[in-house]
UniProtKB/Swiss-Prot annotation:
InterPro entries documented for this protein: HTH_LacI (IPR000843), LacI/GalR-like_sensor (IPR046335), Lambda_DNA-bd_dom_sf (IPR010982), Peripla_BP_I (IPR028082)
Organism classification: Bacteria, Pseudomonadati, Pseudomonadota, Gammaproteobacteria, Enterobacterales
GO terms, biological process: galactose metabolic process; regulation of DNA-templated transcription
DNA-binding interval(s): 4-23
UniProt xrefs under CDD domains: HTH_LacI, PBP1_GalS-like
GO molecular function: DNA-binding transcription factor activity; transcription cis-regulatory region binding
The UniProt record lists the keyword Transcription regulation: yes
NCBIfam families (UniProt xref): PRK10727.1
The protein's annotated pathway: Carbohydrate metabolism; galactose metabolism [regulation]
Domain HTH lacI-type: 1-56
Full protein name: HTH-type transcriptional regulator GalR
Keyword terms: Carbohydrate metabolism, DNA-binding, Galactose metabolism, Repressor, Transcription, Transcription regulation
Subunit structure: Homodimer.
Domain of life: Bacteria
Length: 342
């Protein structure tokens, strides 16, 4: 891999001159710019975005990396961070990581190139060591929905395992023992922790786990449809299903309705997140509230404080989810008809 010294040698200039060209300094002559640019292209040299940005004066811009801004969950996150930016006189720049390591890196580097001194980052695919390196370079970078060992005080996260345990326990408390689970097929900690929470609740109540009652899909409505279709295809040996998120629950509910399976009379359904769709499906969805607005607000305020070198307490910011009772859960009945709803 080419270095800045290789570029200087090929261009016939000093390393300092290469640095001035990279940082767009007015002290760099046009001849130097041409020579350095040509050398960089010949060597396929890409200057470190972090080093360039840190060498320049930061702007009043708050950066945010999300999984996918079209997802209602991330839409709520964006709105919360935008409010913090507005009230503190900052602009907001947004990058999408799409749950892909390379795209997450590109989104972060793009925001750094725009000299965002404060960053709120939702990145699930970049390895811990690489994220830790980035956070050491960028004092105002805060992670949301992830805990990084050694940097816990710069992370804002949810106890996902507890949330899934809470959802499954609620179904058990209503009398269900044959409980399915629809899980995200993304290899991220959220999916792993929520699946563990489901199994925890079953084990705590001495209910044998049945892997045939667990299906996986994309964490959206179509993924929920596919997963519920698969569950039904295995035989309807369940009276309740917990879902990875509300979008999957909405898709699953649609499949149940299409197949003439009543919710909650024949199958109870519980989601996770408490996004907008949970209040507009019919029946309205019982779910687990993810306090994303509060969490995103705290993450943005923390990032700005760190970027401004303000003293902040070195505490772990882990939030606990809560149960939201609506109308998609009831007690199971032998006849499959509605008994009581919450």
């Amino acid at each position: 891999m080419a270095t800045i010294k290789d570029v200087a040698r090929l261009a016939g200039v000093s390393v300092a001159t290469v640095s001035r060209v990279i940082n767009d300094s007015p002290k760099a002559s046009e001849a130097s710019r041409l020579a350095v640019t040509s050398a960089m292209e010949s060597l396929s040299y890409h200057p470190n975005a972090n080093a360039r940005a840190l060498a320049q004066q930061a702007t009043e811009t708050l950066g945010l990396v999300v999984g996918d801004v079209s997802d209602p969950f991330f839409g709520a996150m964006v709105k919360a961070v935008e409010q913090v930016a507005y009230h503190t006189g900052n602009f907001l720049l947004i990058g999408n990581g799409y749950h892909n390591e390379q795209k997450e890196r590109q989104a972060i580097e793009q925001l750094i190139r725009h000299r965002c001194a404060a960053l709120v980052v939702h990145a699930k695919m970049i390895p811990d060591a690489d994220l830790a390196s980035l956070m050491k370079q960028i004092p105002g970078m805060v992670l949301i929905n992830r805990i990084l060992p050694g940097l816990e005080h710069r992370c804002v996260a949810l106890d996902d395992r507890y949330g899934a345990w809470l959802a499954t326990r609620h179904l058990i408390q209503q009398g269900h023992t044959r409980i399915g689970y629809i899980c995200s097929n993304h290899t991220i900690s959220d999916a792993e922790d929520r699946l563990r929470g489901y199994y925890d609740a079953l084990a705590e109540s001495h209910i044998p786990a049945n892997d045939r009652l667990v299906t996986f899909g994309e964490p959206d409505e179509s993924g929920g449809e596919q997963a519920m279709t698969e569950l039904l295809g295995r035989g309807r040996n369940f009276t309740a299903v917990a879902c990875y998120n509300d979008s999957m629950a909405a898709g699953a509910m649609g499949v149940l309705n299409d197949n003439g399976v009543g919710v909650p009379g024949e199958v109870s359904l519980i989601g996770f997140d408490d996004v907008l769709v949970s209040r507009y499906v019919r029946p309205r969805l019982t779910t687990i509230r993810y306090p994303i607005v509060t969490m995103a607000t705290q993450a943005a305020e923390l990032a700005l404080a760190l970027a401004g070198k303000c003293p902040t307490p070195e505490v772990t910011h882990v939030f606990s989810p809560t149960l939201v009772r609506r109308h998609s859960v009831s007690t199971p009945t032998d006849t499959g008809h509605l008994s009581t709803t919450d």
